[in-house]
Amino acid sequence: MKRITILTTFVALLCSVQTALAWGNVGHRTVATIAEKHLTPETKAIVNKYLDGEPLAKNAATWMDRVAFWAKKHWWYIPGWEQLSYWHTMVVDEKFQPSDKRSHKGGGDLLPNLKQCVENLKNYRNLTDSAVVVNLKCVVHMVGDMHCPSHIYFTEFPDCFALPKSLDPEKKGRKARDRMIIYYNGKKMNYHHYWDQIALTELHPEFKSSHDLFSKEFDKATKGKRKKICKGTIDDWVYDIAKSCRPLYNGIKEGDHIGKEYVESTGKLAQWQCAKAGYRLAHILNECFNSK
């Protein structure tokens, strides 16, 4: 492989870097599994080459969560990539368009970095193997993240970037909408955690967290429907995602108690967001690796 021209740009981006585990491992691996089923033979061969034959769902789908600073307490933490911690959330304005607004630490930086990593992959022939692998892992994860409801920051909310000072709703402290305290089957958690860890696994507990079973259940769109989903630019997808997820915040408030009924009422959205993420990820990779 040729030595770099684009890698320097990518390294510079690493220095620009909210915490999250969007969809959890199950969701990210489900998205990756769906995507892999819709790769062209050429793209699949190239991906297999760079990942040493590993499926996208095995390590690539969750790598960005394992290198983030919130993973330091776990044995599977991979040090040296903490700058990527702020690439997990995106920010949209009142018209569901990408916003330049960021938290004081840079949180909400998913979109510009996703776009850059996609551009990098389009030039994969000019990158080192290791640079291709890193860009590939980032794209796989960020496409999953951008489709998760709790990873969208809406600037219409004055508490857009506020983080909780306490998990106790009776105590003072500004909390962002995705961090408001709710109770699922009596268990206290923030709304962000619900979407990261509960929304999918409780939708189909009989799947026992099998991403293969989830992908088979979710991947049912026709060829024509998939083509329509993938039409347009990444910014067009942002509009679709934000518009679809925004109504969630009209139906829940701080301190609400929810259960299986809520899982079922939001289940169609959760399923559809995962499926769209998988189709769009496949579309991106096919465009990057099929380019002449």
Locations of regions flagged by a protein language model:
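Bacterial Sec-dependent N-terminal signal peptides
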Residues: 1-25
